[in-house]
Amino acid sequence: MASITLTPSEKDIQAFLEHYQTSLAPSKNPYIRYFLKLPQATVSIYTSGKILLQGEGAEKYASFFGYQAVEQTSGQNLPLIGTDEVGNGSYFGGLAVVATFVTPDQHDFLRKLGVGDSKTLTDQKIRQITPILKEKIQHQALLLSPSKYNEVIGDRYNAVSVKVALHNQAIYLLLQKGVQPEKIVIDAFTSAKNYDKYLAQEANRFSNPISLEEKAEGKYLSVAVSSVIARDLFLENLENLGRELGYQLPSGAGTASDKVASQILQAYGMQGLSFCAKLHFKNTEKAKKRLER
């Protein structure tokens, strides 16, 4: 039976209780504040602030607090560089790529901090732990602004080759800082064949072999850290761009983005949209059609 112990913030505890309030059950243990019987798991919230999750579904419910089980592989126990990117699926905001160097002796610290794939963490949790990660973990962060993105896409780069360039540059710059990884892992966004093809046009190269692995953020803590820092960088950029234009820019590429894009287009024209959005997305044409109604 899986057993996970966490010490989340009181705010996260209250959010969890609100979400699963129908599963609250009585407990005779005087040290348990709240007890929940959930499908495939029980959750005990102690007066000390600790939470004990038990059962087959423990990991699922622990992910609410940012916990992610990291697969134990031989590669995990090596000094390792891992990279990930955030923003490639969002119409608004730039493209953030981060490379991180993590050694095995840092694993316990990272797990206690609650590091997992940024997709499983709330934005609030990401903003909370990123300053600590940036201070303690060697990394290299790059941000391609929307305006620069629009400048290079369709000219020298496409949506895939620009990510190859950024991942390569982040790793290259991190290696220049003197780190010595025994393995380099990229959270796969294309095939190894494609990656090598686009890499050939990059000037800055290194001899270290790389490995492209799907869902690497769940296998390697270095990739998970990169995912978190990249998400924070993307969110900060999204906020700053929106503040300059006077709009709250949504993440993603849904109808909310179409609506805000049409408003920006009406207020500032294509120049304003180019400042904050990736123009080759279909949202641009959808925003134009909204103005024609």
Curated annotation (Swiss-Prot):
Its cofactor is Mn(2+); Mg(2+). One of its GO terms (cellular component) is ribonuclease H2 complex. This is Ribonuclease HIII. InterPro entries: RNase_HII/HIII, RNase_HII/HIII_dom, RNase_HIII, RNase_HIII_N, RNaseH-like_sf, RNaseH_sf, TBP_dom_sf. Endonuclease that specifically degrades the RNA of RNA-DNA hybrids. The keyword Cytoplasm applies. Residues 78-293 form the RNase H type-2 domain. GO terms for molecular function: magnesium ion binding; RNA binding; RNA-DNA hybrid ribonuclease activity. It is an enzyme of class 3 (hydrolase). Its main location: cytoplasm. The lineage of its organism: Bacteria, Bacillati, Bacillota, Bacilli, Lactobacillales. HAMAP family: RNase_HIII. A divalent metal cation binds at residues 84-85, 187. It catalyses: Endonucleolytic cleavage to 5'-phosphomonoester. The keyword Repeat does not apply. Belongs to the RNase HII family. RnhC subfamily. Gene3D superfamilies: Ribonuclease H-like superfamily/Ribonuclease H, TATA-Binding Protein.
